[in-house]
Amino acid sequence: MGKAEHTTGVKGAKAVDRQAAQAASDSPLTIALVVDTAGNEGNGTSNSALQYARELRRQGHVVRLVGIGSPDYPVAQRHVPLVSWVAAKQQMQFAQPDTEVFRKAFQGADVVHVYLPFAYGRAAVRTAHEMGIPATAGFHLQPENVLYSAGPLRYVPGASAFLYWLFNRMLYRHIRHIHTPSHMIAAQLRAHGYRQRLHVISNGYAPRFTPKQQREPGSPSPRPFMIVASGRLASEKDHATLIRAVALSRHAKDIELLICGTGPLQRELRHMAAELLPGRWSIGFHDNAQMPALLRSCDLLVHPSIVDIESLSVLEGMASGLVPVIAKSAQSAAGQFALTDRSLFDARDPVMLAQRIDWWIEHPDELSHWGAVYAEHTRQEYSIESCVREFVAMEREAIADFDGVL
């Protein structure tokens, strides 16, 4: 009898433990998101952080945004000679580490998630661990992107490998769970010696990007035919190839080109467009709030970028019902989104891109069909809701195996 009672007691205890574990797995988390620029949707990393924050809150979690421009936990900007000037042209700022703000923001948090490996992020992880709070990190800054912004330095042998090593040394070696937005960048981390637990989770797209109404079968190709591209106006985004391709198109006079973004090459790209393009064009910054309507008004999305960890702009375009035409590059993950070969062209090849553009202009029924296919595929595979649920699962795993050891 005693043995039976003891056995029943153990089973009861295990049942209670299982119930407690289940309750913990369903309970809302308090997550501190540490991103240098927390109040700016002009660059991809900040945009991703703000989208995740909104969806985390919608799913019932408590989010504390910590960074420049945060309404609740703001920090000062850190000025780095020359580097800050270049970064500002790409809507980026560096945050000043602030232990007092960190401690206030992290008090009572379940986990801290850091976006970038600079001094600000390193200080946040150090503070979290001192407070006994687990920290995770995202790998959102591709070393190849840094090198393209550094001019001739990108031609130095081994420069990219050095940056992968440096980022690991500065931050990621103190992290057990890393969020990578694509399999491509996860493979790069493995190739460069990262041994942490890698979680491949898309940045997702916001639900306000909804599909446009596709044209009825038999409708002629629209005039003007509006082509849109979105991204930093920097050399690695290679908008120059897009401008040359539009100039080579058989339908150049009927094309209206919109390149949405800001960056160091804005003046140069505008000068090139003025010289080469017979049709209308616009190159410059567009407020993020305007992008859903703008994308739905366009006919084709071109993404000529050579370097991308994922490319949120392609996701948003596909979700809006646009067919993408994407550069194939070993340093870009964006090609993973292509559902047909006619959505790909060889990077830096304006002739091939012009051929792709002409084919889609001359096949309006296929353009409408594939636009609807891309929109539905994106809704099923890359919704912010499903991506954030995977992110929360990663955070719960990090919390469960945290032992306080750096």
Functional labels for PLM-detected ranges:
Residues 117, 306:
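Aromatic "clamp/platform" in nucleotide-sugar-dependent glycosyltransferases that forms part
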Residues 184, 204:
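Carbohydrate-associated surface elements
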Residues 323-327:
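Short hydrophobic beta-strand element within catalytic cores of glycosyltransferases
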